[in-house]
């Protein structure tokens, strides 16, 4: 079924899906009227059109450009952190406040239980993530998923609490960046993010980070240091957004598509570069096409990764995590 929000490259598919829906309505009416000849003709037309829809859907979504994946990552109907928490976990207890200044609604977190009966797995975890809104009112409440310093300090407080009780940490990353306002700078935005990098590298519990949508710059890495970095298929992760990169290099946002290509910010790019460890496949058309399937796929991956990490010694965990991030990037000492 077509979604309410249609991206430019999805319009041909959306039009076909609308036509298919109209024909199905006509088929039901024809069946009620006992018009056998018309019903048989409509069935044949619907079958032909369904084949066209499936072919076009595969053609579009299996050949997405980097910029088109950025657009999908920003789709307003994608599942957000709280959606994943309630679909994947039980008994979520939200914990609020950084105990210094305020409670940042752009980051949510708390204890929850993740269970998988088939794998005989049940574990209490600390889950933390960026939270966006779906309309103007909720986006203002969540600050469009752009965390303030108190958001990162809240996240760190919850991580240290998890460490105290020996519980694994799962972070869900989906942000256009840390909030760049003057008030955030005055309250130590850079220090808060830097402190999180230091502390997360040394947490003596398993840490799994998942980029579920946008992974922009320091706003993402502020809760993005872990033993395993997972990324859903149509997410993006980069030091800068394509629009901002285009604005800096070409003094205009109109080169954002070229910027996206140059940044190599997709899951496939980052897996090849060794930045992430695993790609979580999305339903054809994006996570918003089937949120429940997406959540189940991610949950299965999390259970697998947690099962492996929880068998490791604490000292081994920290040592491997530090070496993992120290090895990232390319260095030229002769330049």
Swiss-Prot record:
Ranges of residues in domain CoA carboxyltransferase C-terminal: 48-308
Biological source species: Prosthecochloris aestuarii (strain DSM 271 / SK 413)
GO annotation terms (biological process): fatty acid biosynthetic process; malonyl-CoA biosynthetic process
Family the UniProt entry places it in: Belongs to the AccA family.
Functional description taken from the UniProt entry: Component of the acetyl coenzyme A carboxylase (ACC) complex. First, biotin carboxylase catalyzes the carboxylation of biotin on its carrier protein (BCCP) and then the CO(2) group is transferred by the carboxyltransferase to acetyl-CoA to form malonyl-CoA.
Subunit structure: Acetyl-CoA carboxylase is a heterohexamer composed of biotin carboxyl carrier protein (AccB), biotin carboxylase (AccC) and two subunits each of ACCase subunit alpha (AccA) and ACCase subunit beta (AccD).
GO MF entry, a single one: carboxyl- or carbamoyltransferase activity
Protein name: Acetyl-coenzyme A carboxylase carboxyl transferase subunit alpha
């Amino acid at each position: 079924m077509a979604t309410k929000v249609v991206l430019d490259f999805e319009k041909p598919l959306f039009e076909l899906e609308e036509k298919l829906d109209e024909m199905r309505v006509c088929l039901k009416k024809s069946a009620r009227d006992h018009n056998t000849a018309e019903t048989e003709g409509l069935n044949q037309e619907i079958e032909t059109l369904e084949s066209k829809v499936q072919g076009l859907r595969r053609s579009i979504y299996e050949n997405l450009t980097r910029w088109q994946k950025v657009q999908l990552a920003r789709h307003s109907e994608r599942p957000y952190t709280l959606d994943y928490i309630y679909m994947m976990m039980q008994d979520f207890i939200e914990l609020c406040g950084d105990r210094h200044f305020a409670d940042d609604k752009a980051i949510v977190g708390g204890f929850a239980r993740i269970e998988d009966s088939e794998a005989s797995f049940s574990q209490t975890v600390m889950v933390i993530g960026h939270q966006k809104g779906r309309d103007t009112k909720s986006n203002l409440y969540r600050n469009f998923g752009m965390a303030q310093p108190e958001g990162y300090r809240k996240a760190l407080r919850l991580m240290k609490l998890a460490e105290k009780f020996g519980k694994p940490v799962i972070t869900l990353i989906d942000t256009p960046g840390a909030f760049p306002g003057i008030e955030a700078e005055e309250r130590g935005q850079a220090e808060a993010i830097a402190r999180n990098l230091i502390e997360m590298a040394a947490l003596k519990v398993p840490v799994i980070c998942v980029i579920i949508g946008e992974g922009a710059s320091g706003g993402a890495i502020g809760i993005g240091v872990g033993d395993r970095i997972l990324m859903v298929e149509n997410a993006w992760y980069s030091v800068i957004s394509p629009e901002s990169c285009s604005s800096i290099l070409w003094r205009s946002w109109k080169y954002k598509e070229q910027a996206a290509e140059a940044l190599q910010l997709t899951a496939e790019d980052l897996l090849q570069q060794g930045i992430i460890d695993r790609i979580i496949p999305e339903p054809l058309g994006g996570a918003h096409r089937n949120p429940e399937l997406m959540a189940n796929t991610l949950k299965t991956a999390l259970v697998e990764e947690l099962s492996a990490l929880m068998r490791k010694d604490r000292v081994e965990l920290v040592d491997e995590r530090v070496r993992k991030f120290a090895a990232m990037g390319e260095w030229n000492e002769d330049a």
